[in-house]
Amino acid sequence: MLLLQIILLLLPVICSAGDRKPRHYEINLDEPPSQRWNQVIKDHLEYLPGVVEETKKYIPKPLQPFVWWAASKIDRYFTTEIQEELKGIASESGLPIGEIVGMNILYDVAAFDRRHIFGLGCTSIVAQNSAGQIIHGRNLDYDMTELLKNITIHVDFVRNGTIQYSGLTFALYNGVLTGQRPGEYSVSLNARYSGAYIDNILMEFYTKFKRPVSFFIRDVLENQATYTEAVDAFSRTHLFSPSYIIVAGIKKNEGVVISRNRWSAANVYPLNVDANQWFLVETNFDNWKKQGDDRRITAIQKLKELGRRNFDEKSMVEVLSTVPVRNNLTVFSTVMVPGLPDSADYFRQSTWILP
């Protein structure tokens, strides 16, 4: 605990006075699933109708009838636990189950080609410093920035009084796009643009809607105990839509960017400190293709400027806070260090919502 306190004191005052921490909740996995999210919903009722209405604007009109009809029918394909959680959220919020399910599969429906995608992006960074510590930084950028800031929450998923895994997510959303299994690994998801509407729809039917990516990440965090197991699951499993899945572990070279198509990994790009590849930067572009993304270029320049020898959690915050890595669409920033003895506490304390 003393080490955690020292590290937190060293976080720079790059976070402006308007930055704030997300609300923290414990989701008790020993409770009936239909009751787990009740307090979260009660605390955010005033924001929920606006979020749902805004979400509808980002579903292309040709897809809207299918999406909302299908969303009201497909929860039966999810695990029983997820089904019951969704029904509980719908009941507590007073919103139709179709709208709740639709919110939770929005990424999977909308992750199509760049010409039609709404403003969705992220920056994920994994770095190994000279002491061997693995540090995972993440900015989540999203077009509904102001609305999402009001419903961003930090959740510890607890069983038998012990934190099993943690995640940054949103009220109404029981999946996870940014998370950590304490003492083992952390994960973040970035959008990857590949294919067209019909490709996602066909894959959804093929998988019988069983694997929305946010539910899958949560499942991996709960059931895959190690970095190696998690990377294997993230690389091999069929998913609805393309994505970049970034994973950080606790041992040498345990950091990877998995560029996913719908079937499996299209590319796996790991840390390799022996070849001086001590950091990985992923935004929303394939790392093996030429591209001019200013966020990625700036992050790489900043990492090289700071250097590996003295790189630490404070340094990662500095990279995440540099414009345009941090930009007008950034909802929150976080730093995860899964190898810390108090990694769950650190994750909770090292997340901030931008003003």
Curated annotation (Swiss-Prot):
N-glycosylated. Autoproteolytic cleavage at pH 4.5 gives rise to the alpha and beta subunit. Cleavage gives rise to a conformation change that activates the enzyme. The same catalytic Cys residue mediates the autoproteolytic cleavage and subsequent hydrolysis of lipid substrates. Its EC number is 3.5.1.60. Glycans are attached at residues 150, 160, 328. One of its GO terms (cellular component) is lysosome. Keywords: Autocatalytic cleavage, Fatty acid metabolism, Glycoprotein, Hydrolase, Lipid degradation, Lipid metabolism, Lysosome, Membrane, Signal, Zymogen. It is found in: Lysosome; Membrane. Its main location: other. It is a peripheral membrane protein. It catalyses: N-hexadecanoylethanolamine + H2O = ethanolamine + hexadecanoate; an N-(long-chain fatty acyl)ethanolamine + H2O = a long-chain fatty acid + ethanolamine. Degrades bioactive fatty acid amides, such as N-palmitoylethanolamine, to ethanolamine and free fatty acids. Heterodimer of an alpha and a beta subunit, produced by autocatalytic cleavage. Belongs to the acid ceramidase family. This is N-acylethanolamine-hydrolyzing acid amidase. It comes from Caenorhabditis elegans.
